[in-house]
């Protein structure tokens, strides 16, 4: 296992990078997902209900927002709960990977034990962290169905030396998309208490590469970052939160232009 708090924070680092972890770039045989879809029968425990509520709200947000920010109708995804390990379109995934998005079968996966430990360790803050994870993973789905992820992989292939830089930009954009969703929640006065927005920002910081390396006792080397620093992740979540506009999530500095 990964050891202490939030499963060592190492697992939370993995909530966003399934293709790298499982060696999938969207090619190869697709195995069926094994688990329970996040329908009514799956939303039983408190943490499951929190995730299911976030899934419903994030889905509705993108159904409304997608036609404005991108072209066409939002191609929805689904969330699969699993325990221990599961088979996905990206290969076999264990609980050590944590929550993730698979671009091949276009599904979001949540390990139930991970979510329960998140809540046990952090209480209400864990609830907000779980919602942040949902919004972030749905951001990866948006990147996938809009072709952003494909363009990033092409750029990484043409410029291997900048591969990590493009990975960071992809993750920061998903953080910004999550912030745009959180902005819609704030507009509807759906946060339970004033401190929840700050908790979301702290959740974004907690998965910064520098924080994760520091907690693991490893040297902090910005050149090795694949997700962004705590400051960057907070900054881009804040950008989405402040603007409420996914089109302002310009983390690539024009690199994705045709």
Could you tell me what each predicted segment is?
Residues 62, 110, 128-145, 175, ...:
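Active-site recognition of the HExxH zinc-binding catalytic motif
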Residues 207-258:
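Pan-zinc metallopeptidase signature
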Residues 1-37:
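Long amphipathic alpha-helical segments used for membrane anchoring, targeting, substrate engagement
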Residues 114-132, 162-166:
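Short pre-active-site segment immediately N-terminal to the catalytic Zn-binding motif
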Residues 49-71, 169-212:
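Short helix/loop segments within enzyme catalytic domains
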Residues 144-171:
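Post-HEXXH active-site segment of zinc metalloproteases
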Residues 27, 84-111:
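Catalytic zinc-binding patch centered on the HExxH motif and its immediate surroundings
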Residues 26-82, 249-252:
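Extracytoplasmic low-complexity, Pro/Thr/Ser/Ala/Gly-rich segments
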């Amino acid at each position: 296992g990964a050891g202490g708090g939030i499963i060592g924070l190492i697992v939370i680092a993995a909530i966003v990078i399934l293709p790298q972890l499982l060696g999938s770039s969207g090619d190869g045989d697709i195995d069926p997902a094994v688990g329970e879809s996040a329908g009514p029968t799956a939303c039983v425990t408190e943490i499951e209900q929190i995730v299911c509520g976030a899934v419903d709200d994030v889905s509705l947000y993108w159904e409304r927002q997608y036609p404005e920010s991108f072209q066409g109708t939002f191609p929805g995804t689904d969330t699969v709960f699993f325990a221990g390990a599961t088979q996905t379109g990206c290969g076999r995934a264990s609980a050590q990977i944590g929550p993730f998005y698979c671009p091949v079968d276009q599904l979001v996966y949540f390990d139930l034990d991970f979510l329960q430990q998140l809540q046990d360790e952090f209480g209400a803050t864990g609830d907000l962290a779980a919602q942040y994870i949902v919004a972030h993973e749905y951001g990866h789905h948006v990147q996938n169905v809009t072709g952003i992820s494909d363009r990033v992989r092409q750029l990484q292939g043409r410029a291997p030396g900048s591969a990590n830089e493009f990975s960071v930009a992809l993750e920061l954009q998903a953080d910004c998309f999550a912030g745009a969703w959180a902005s819609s929640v704030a507009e509807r006065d759906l946060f339970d208490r004033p401190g929840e927005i700050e908790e979301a920002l702290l959740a974004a910081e907690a998965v910064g590469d520098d924080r994760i390396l520091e907690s693991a006792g490893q040297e902090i080397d910005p050149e090795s970052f694949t997700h962004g620093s705590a400051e960057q992740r907070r900054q881009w979540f804040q950008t989405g939160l402040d603007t409420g506009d996914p089109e302002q999530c310009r983390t690539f500095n024009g690199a994705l232009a045709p």
